[in-house]
Amino acid sequence: MSDAASQRKMWGARFDRDPDASFYEFERSWKFDCRLLPQEFALDRAWAQAIARGGILTKEEGEQIVGALDALETRSKSDPAWLDSSKAEDVHHFVETALIEKLGALGAKLHTGRSRNDMIATEFRMYVKEAAREIRRAIASLEHAIAEQAERNLKVPMPGTTHMQHAQPLLLSHWLLAHGEAFHRDAERVAAAALRANVCPLGSGALSGCAFPLDRKALANDLGFSSISANSLDAVSDRDFTLEYLFALSTLAMHLSRLAEDFVLFASPEFGFVELPDEFSTGSSLMPQKKNPDAWELIRGKTGRIYGSLMALFVTMKGLPSSYQRDLQEDKENLFQAHDQALAMVHIAAATLAASQFREDRLRAAAQDPALVATELADYLVTFGVPFREAHEIVGKVLRAAGQEGKSIREMSIERLKEFSPVFDRNLATALTLESALARRSLPGGTAPGAVQSALQEFKRRLAGLESDL
């Protein structure tokens, strides 16, 4: 049998001429959808059993087909050259051709009642469900690294910023757990996308449904789905679950990029808050002193590629009429690439963070900046009945005067402060300490040591719940 005949096997009888060789290479998807071979074999086995139950195959024929599929799957795992040399149009064509070569006419019966349209919609959903589980496992490892660093640095202070300007003091553990909260939401978002994928389109045919007596619910159960699709036309063209998974990956990548940005800044000499591990850093071919945060920079850079995958599929989908269109073939490479990149980014982030050494001396020294307790000065006035807006204005004037006099607010004498408000007294000094500023933020979610300790325990409890769900 010629290559061209093989290429046309699933649909070629209506045509007089073979496909142009350049067009065939352009349109064939085997080179990337071969990744769906495990899902293809699982679907084919379930379909063979379903049509045997429906009387389309005898029990013996169904068993023969399942046995042949098992043998082909075993070969596919042990013979990569077989896969690499294939000229199949797609993953469905590859398996059907091999099955017919093995079983003859019996192998040709397997496609009864189904279409590549409902097959690929089903297999892609199966893939997304497993991919989501893989990403959530990786996120759990990143959350572990965050929890361990937070425990190790539980009471280490640091300057908190807004607009990249010193704002109020924080605990380093509070900063770490802030990132942890974002990643935990990512795990939930990925799970929600997988939930949307947990609907079985198989039995929808090309667009109008299946004409043979099959139990779709039993088929869905065999393939690990929780329900069946409600409308065959929608089922073969729906890629919402793909977009949702790509959106979840894009949001995850955005959170990774923000974590990376913090680390790049904190590792710079101007900050010096963290020593990056040698094994996740690189040097310069010219400047021997350099230790570059390439792990974090690459995480930041790869985020754009994941955004691109999401936008590419949005643009592909926006102009499609109802039902399946060949444009939908473009969904898979976008998702495969985004999944692979996101998975690698999470693994590298977890490993780099776990091996990083935070410099308590630099963090503590930076947290002593008197400007960080300016809010404490206003709060102090409020405790004596001064309205906050008035207190804010008083402290603003104090800060302006201190700057003009070349002093910090801690260096301003009580007598000088009383010129701005008679409320100031000698108990003020204790209110302006770093320890006091941290301790006063004791409500749940705050940066006081006790609040952060409680938050860490709750974070670990939710992490355990995530892991038990995998």
How would you name each of these model-derived features?
Residues 2-43, 105-106, 272, 287-470:
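Glycine-rich cofactor/substrate-binding loops
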Residues 44, 92, 96, 242-245, ...:
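Short runs of predominantly hydrophobic/aromatic residues within well-ordered alpha helices
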Residues 56-57, 225, 386, 407:
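Helix N-cap/coil-helix junction residues
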Residues 124-129, 136, 151, 158-319, ...:
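Charged, flexible cofactor/metal-binding loops and thiol motifs
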